[in-house]
Design a protein with these regions (language model features):
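Carbohydrate-recognition beta-sandwich/jelly-roll modules
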Residues: 1-68, 72-75, 92-94, 106, ...
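Aromatic- and carboxylate-enriched substrate-binding clefts and catalytic-loop regions
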Residues: 67-280
């Protein structure tokens, strides 16, 4: 059956129960040391969207903000249809590839770095690559849904696709890095495939598989990701954006999810924006 084995350790000493996780080196720590992250939360389905974003960024440049890493959301690839997986074409309503490439070139002229979103968790039925055979399964054999008309991609399939897709994004658009969504954001068991002969049907299988997928994205440039379960992948990417969960994040005690003796080389925690935008 589908089972997990858990071991619980209790102690009055924090350092005795802190999990020991490997900390690989991505080799990009110095590259990002001086850069502030600018996270674009949403891009409207309009041909003026990139112009508006650029004007905002140019205003920041005039104010003296010279080192900025601009992280782009999944709307770069779609116009509200959620087809953001394995895509190599800019969203049509925003001007397609021409508008996206011109905008990214303009960011370089400002001296800013950019990252484009990638996601290997699910695939939409509207995606040209959609095939029921590449979808993970539930225990009853049906494709595992992750949202409206979207299904969990077999993570063995994702693992084989991710390296080339990530490299293709950087080669085509000349961006500085990749912004990986979901893989360090949701728990690794959410990627479990219950189909016959599945390569990741348990936490013990899913965790190293997700670590491999994340690691493949840092081979050709900067790689950052959305967090939430990022403590399981310390050092695999160059950094994680992870807001504290809950209705009132500023009133929730921060979760200590890092080794206090190795805070600096693993991650930097920061709070910016409104009081409810503290990062975990």
């Amino acid at each position: 059956g589908f089972q997990e084995r858990w071991m619980l350790t209790a102690s009055t000493q924090f350092d005795e129960v802190l999990p020991t996780l490997s900390i690989p080196g991505t080799g990009q720590t110095d590259t990002l040391a001086e850069y502030t992250w600018y996270n674009i939360p949403h891009i409207k389905a309009s041909e003026e969207s990139y112009v508006e974003i650029y004007e905002n960024l140019r205003s920041l440049k005039r104010l003296g903000l010279d080192y900025l890493l601009v992280n782009h959301p999944d709307e770069t690839w779609h116009d509200e249809d959620g087809n953001d997986t394995l895509t190599l074409t800019g969203a049509e309503a925003k001007g397609g590839d021409d508008a996206l490439s011109e905008y990214l070139d303009a960011l370089k002229d400002l001296g800013y770095k950019s990252s484009l979103q990638v996601n290997y968790r699910h695939i939409a039925t509207s995606n040209p690559l959609w095939n029921p055979e590449i979808a993970a399964q539930l225990s009853d054999g049906s494709p595992a849904p992750t949202g409206p008309d979207r299904y969990l991609l077999k993570q063995s399939e994702a693992q084989s696709i991710a390296p080339d897709h990530g490299r293709s994004i950087i080669d085509k658009y000349k961006c500085d890095g990749l912004y990986v969504s979901e893989h360090a954001e949701v728990p690794p068991w959410e990627f479990n495939d219950l189909g016959p002969n599945a390569s990741a049907s348990s936490l013990a299988d899913s965790h190293p598989l997700q670590q491999s997928i994340l690691s493949s994205q840092s081979k050709h440039g900067i790689a950052i990701g959305k967090g939430g379960n990022h403590w399981l992948y310390g050092g695999v990417l160059n950094g994680y954006l992870a807001r504290i969960v809950g209705a009132e994040p500023s009133r929730i005690p921060p979760l200590v999810d890092f080794d206090l003796n190795n805070l600096h080389p693993i991650e930097t925690d920061a709070g910016v924006g409104t009081i409810e935008q503290y990062f975990a």
